[in-house]
A protein has these predicted regions:
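Residue-level signal for inorganic ion chemistry
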Residues: 16, 20, 42, 53, ...
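An extended, acidic
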Residues: 152-282
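N-terminal subdomain of lithium-sensitive/metallo-dependent phosphomonoesterases centered on the IMPase/IPPase/PAP
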Residues: 1-90, 274-282
Length: 282
C-alpha cells in the first residue's frame, strides 16, 4: 500500500505550520545532550505526525528526530524494511529559535528502505513543495486549509563566481575554501533545498542526518540535482542498502557517512570539490 497522498501531507503541514508559527516569536527552548536545540514546537509537531503515522499494528512506522531514540531495535528494523514516514518537525531549529525565517518542516516516505517521496513546508511563506508519483508540485496558501496546488518546474541557478553556496557548520568552520562564491551557513537543510529548487543558491556542502534530508532529497533528485562525495560517489535515495548512512546503534546513527556536494549537475559538484581542502570527511 502506498500511503503518500498530497491531501494528507498538506493537511498535516497546515496543522504543523500553525503550531510552529504559534511559538515562533518566543519558542520555549532546551538544549539536548548533543548540544542542539529543541523547542516545544518540535515536540508538538512530531506528536502530530506520530498520531497519523506511528501505527505498527498496521505495518506503518515513523522515524522522527525527537522520538527515534525511544524506539527499540525491532521497531527500527521494521521501519527500515517496510513502510515508514521520516519527519523533522522543525528543520533549522537554531534559526527558528532565533526568529530567522530559514527553517521548515520535512517529511519523507520510505518503502523497503528507499526514499520514494518527499515534501518540505515553509510556514513563514505559507508554501510547500512535494513529490508525487514522479512529479513535483508547489502548494501555496497551505495554512488556509484550501491550498493552491500546481505542477512545479525547478529553476536551478546557473553557475557564476557570484552564485551563493551553502555549507554545513563543520565544513565552514574547518575546511579551506577557495571558491570566490558567497558562502552561507544557515544550519538548515529545508531552507537550502527551497532555495536550490527556486534558483536562489547554486549549491550546498551537506553532512546531516536522515530526517534532515528525507523530505528534500527526493525533490532534488527528481529535479535533476547531483549529490556526490569527494570521490564522486553518489548519495542516492536507497537509505538501507546504499551504504551512505550509519544505521547501526551508536553515536553516529542516522548520520551521513560522508560529506556530499549538491549542485545542478555533476560538473558543478566537481567544481566545488576542486576548490576546497576538506578535513574530517566522515
Amino acid at each position: 500500500m502506498n500511503r503518500w497522498k498530497i491531501d494528507t501531507v498538506l493537511a498535516l503541514f497546515r496543522e504543523a505550520g500553525e503550531i510552529a508559527l504559534r511559538y515562533y516569536d518566543d519558542p520555549p527552548l532546551e538544549i539536548k545532550a548533543d548540544h542542539t536545540p529543541v523547542t516545544q514546537a518540535d515536540r508538538e509537531i512530531e506528536a502530530l505526525f506520530a498520531a497519523r503515522f506511528d501505527r505498527p499494528a498496521e505495518a506503518l512506522y515513523l522515524i522522527g528526530e525527537e522520538t527515534v531514540d525511544r524506539r527499540d531495535e525491532a521497531y527500527i528494523s521494521a521501519a527500515l524494511a517496510g513502510e515508514c514516514f521520516v519527519v523533522d518537525p522543525i528543520d533549522g531549529t537554531a534559526p527558528y529559535a532565533a526568529g530567522v525565517p530559514l527553517w521548515g518542516i520535512s517529511l519523507g516516505y520510505m518503502r523497503g528502505g528507499v526514499l520514494t517521496e518527499g515534501a518540505i513546508c515553509l510556514p513563514v511563506r505559507d508554501e510547500a513543495f512535494l513529490t508525487c508519483r514522479g512529479s513535483i508540485f508547489r502548494a501555496r496558501r497551505v495554512l488556509s486549509g484550501a491550498p493552491e496546488v500546481e505542477p512545479f518546474m525547478p529553476e536551478p541557478m546557473r553557475y557564476t563566481p557570484a552564485a551563493p553556496v551553502c555549507a554545513a557548520q563543520n565544513a565552514a568552520r574547518g575546511w579551506e575554501i577557495s571558491f570566490p562564491n558567497q558562502l552561507f551557513v544557515w544550519s538548515t537543510c529545508v531552507g537550502v533545498y527551497d532555495c536550490l529548487l527556486r534558483g536562489k543558491v547554486y549549491g550546498m556542502i551537506q553532512h546531516c542526518k536522515l530526517w534532515d534530508l528525507a523530505g528534500g532529497m527526493p525533490l532534488l533528485k527528481l529535479a535533476g540535482f547531483e549529490a556526490r562525495g569527494a570521490d564522486g560517489r553518489e548519495l542516492g535515495l536507497d537509505v538501507v542498502s546504499g551504504g551512505n548512512f550509519y544505521l547501526e546503534n551508536g553515536p553516529h546513527r542516522w548520520r551521513q557517512k560522508d560529506y556530499v556536494v549538491i549542485a545542478p549537475d555533476r560538473q558543478g559538484t566537481e567544481a566545488i570539490w576542486n576548490q576546497v581542502k576538506a578535513k574530517n570527511l566522515s
